[in-house]
């Protein structure tokens, strides 16, 4: 694993103990290594990233929230610095089971869950299935009413045979073409920010790091996108699917819940946030102005402030 000497190791710079490692049983019962970091003391607050991302996406929230809570950031299986078991196919819903096991391993009391995008969908499912694990729930720009994959590159990866993606990974093509890959990723990541200029070269380095330096990342992300695409197809065809199950069971979420949505989110419109709020009984909705899909990067100051205010209001 190579880290550019000009770049400080993000884990080391962010968490007192740097990057830590936890072994859980995954959804199929295999031991799996999960990368995580934690900072602060008090009640646990877990930050959950979205599709193709990793803990770095919460870089602007760790310091602010850890003044009041024990903040835990982890990379989901297959993402970031966590293990990527290429020889095993994933099945839908595995992330919910694994998230449950991570919480049980790291927390001995109900946690605050702050989850963005696909992570929010996982958190909603967990709140329905294991409400005792969650004290407060905060979800940001969640694809709970998504009717299609929101970006052409996601659609492309979802259509590409996994064997092809594994070959790209094994040949280390993203590593060999790292400057080009970073440039393309930078263009796309800026498109989900209200102010694209806030994304730095260091940000691009770390956002793309797992793809260029950690073999297996591209293949596992493609696999997750294929699962998501199948889900949407099944939803459209009225076949059994997890999306419908989550949608139909939103009223079962009883813990105080905050729904945050970027007003300018071009992936999942703010109307989805209003609809989600209407379906969760004990919820509050806040639309974030001047904010696109990537709220944890693009609207971090107001996001952190709103989270802390909500937790104070609900006495947590």
Model-identified regions with their sequence ranges:
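Short beta-strand/loop motif that positions the catalytic acidic residue
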Residues: 253, 259-261
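Conserved alpha/beta-hydrolase catalytic His-Asp/Glu region
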Residues: 175-249
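Active-site loop/oxyanion-hole signature of alpha/beta-hydrolase fold enzymes
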Residues: 15, 27-30, 37-39, 73-118, ...
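Conserved HGGG/HGGXW glycine-rich cap/lid loop of the alpha/beta-hydrolase fold
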Residues: 35-84
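Catalytic active-site module of serine/aspartate enzymes centered on a nucleophile-bearing elbow/loop
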Residues: 274-275, 279-316
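Alpha/beta-hydrolase fold catalytic core
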Residues: 1-45, 66-70, 97, 101-109, ...
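Flexible "cap/lid" loop of the alpha/beta hydrolase fold
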Residues: 128, 137-179
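Acidic catalytic loop of the alpha/beta-hydrolase fold
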Residues: 264-268
